[in-house]
Amino acid sequence: DAFVLSSPEYHGTMSGVMKNNLDWLSSEQASGKVFGLMSTLGGRTNSNTLNHMRIVARWVHGWVVPEQVAIGNVESAFDESGQLIEESIRNRVSGLAESLVTSTVKLRR
């Protein structure tokens, strides 16, 4: 009932692997489903990849929640155990997950 899309950003857009996967996603599979979006970047945070994934999700008639997460400087964003270091980013990921679940439940009614 929901999708979480997460992609690294390469040359200002989603990865080729993500784009290829989305090219195979049909509106029959995605119509009415809820989408949550995340991206990672080697440098400063921006919204290019998130915006491009949003366009594709809308094109296949999906509902994208307004919360989104972009993790910049990804090489230093996680500790040795793979946990996000910054509490503000952890809170944003939690907020995205909460919005995704809440929206999915509401659309199923």
Q: Could you tell me what each predicted segment is?
A:
Residues 1-60:
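Helix-loop-strand module that forms the ligand-binding subsite of alpha/beta enzymes
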Residues 63-109:
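Glycine-rich phosphate/pyrophosphate-binding loop and the adjoining helix
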